[in-house]
């Protein structure tokens, strides 16, 4: 609970600045890149959260990372700030909260679409279009693969779940036959 409220505070502050500067979408993208870089590098996490390294050393590393990833100053400063305050563990929650705020601000929804096999671009676009019609909003897909579905897809938009998986259809058929 505490982690969520602290992450929201950081995300809202950065989001307010992004709105003020008209940089919501670029910063959202930059934060996703930053999150992936930190999650993908245990060494980087260690350097940023280890008090053995001085603030200057950590700042230099963040600046090199920002330069390598071509990040703007503000998203990069978030990483330094969290590391400096021993709150690097909050990075994913801050980025996810910022993403939610950005989606809301830009009038779009995220849908988690799970399929038995990876979706090609045209199938993903067709699903996004159908979900957009159903929700009257622009829908962005977060795709996942679950071979246990056997076929079809499950789409979750907020609290709504559209289950068109073969697994569910077979389970429903089994229940009907048992009756």
Curated annotation (Swiss-Prot):
Localisation per UniProt entry: Cell inner membrane
Keywords associated with the record: ATP synthesis, Cell inner membrane, Cell membrane, CF(1), Hydrogen ion transport, Ion transport, Membrane, Transport
Topology in membrane: Peripheral membrane protein
This protein's record includes keyword Cell inner membrane: yes
The keyword Cell membrane appears for this protein: yes
Alphabetized InterPro entries for the sequence: ATP_synth_OSCP/delta_N_sf, ATPase_OSCP/dsu
Source taxon at top rank: Bacteria
SUPFAM superfamilies, per the entry: N-terminal domain of the delta subunit of the F1F0-ATP synthase
Molecular function per GO: proton-transporting ATP synthase activity, rotational mechanism
Pfam family, one: OSCP
GO cellular component: plasma membrane; proton-transporting ATP synthase complex
Annotated HAMAP family: ATP_synth_delta_bact
Subunit structure comment from the entry: F-type ATPases have 2 components, F(1) - the catalytic core - and F(0) - the membrane proton channel. F(1) has five subunits: alpha(3), beta(3), gamma(1), delta(1), epsilon(1). F(0) has three main subunits: a(1), b(2) and c(10-14). The alpha and beta chains form an alternating ring which encloses part of the gamma chain. F(1) is attached to F(0) by a central stalk formed by the gamma and epsilon chains, while a peripheral stalk is formed by the delta and b chains.
Family that this chain belongs to: Belongs to the ATPase delta chain family.
Classification via NCBIfam families: ATP_synt_delta, PRK05758.2-2
Function: F(1)F(0) ATP synthase produces ATP from ADP in the presence of a proton or sodium gradient. F-type ATPases consist of two structural domains, F(1) containing the extramembraneous catalytic core and F(0) containing the membrane proton channel, linked together by a central stalk and a peripheral stalk. During catalysis, ATP synthesis in the catalytic domain of F(1) is coupled via a rotary mechanism of the central stalk subunits to proton translocation. This protein is part of the stalk that links CF(0) to CF(1). It either transmits conformational changes from CF(0) to CF(1) or is implicated in proton conduction.
Name of the molecule in the record: ATP synthase subunit delta
Species: Anaeromyxobacter dehalogenans (strain 2CP-1 / ATCC BAA-258)
GN (gene name): atpH
């Amino acid at each position: 609970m505490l982690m969520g409220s602290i992450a929201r505070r950081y995300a809202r502050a950065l989001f307010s600045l992004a709105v003020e500067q008209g940089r919501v979408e670029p910063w959202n993208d930059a934060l996703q890149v930053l999150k992936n870089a930190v999650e993908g590098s245990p060494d980087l996490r260690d350097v940023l959260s280890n008090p053995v390294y001085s603030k200057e050393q950590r700042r230099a590393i963040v600046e090199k990372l920002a330069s390598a990833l071509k990040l703007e100053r503000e998203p990069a400063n978030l990483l330094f700030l969290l590391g400096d305050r021993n709150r690097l563990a909050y990075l994913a929650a801050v980025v996810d909260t910022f993403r939610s705020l950005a989606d809301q601000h830009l009038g779009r929804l995220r849908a988690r679409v799970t399929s038995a096999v990876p979706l090609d671009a045209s199938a993903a676009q067709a699903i996004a279009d159908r979900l957009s019609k159903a929700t009257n909003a622009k829908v962005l897909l977060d795709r996942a693969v679950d071979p246990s579905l056997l076929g079809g897809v499950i789409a979750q938009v907020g609290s709504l779940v559209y289950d068109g998986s073969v697994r569910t259809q077979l389970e429903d058929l089994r229940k009907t036959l048992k009756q």
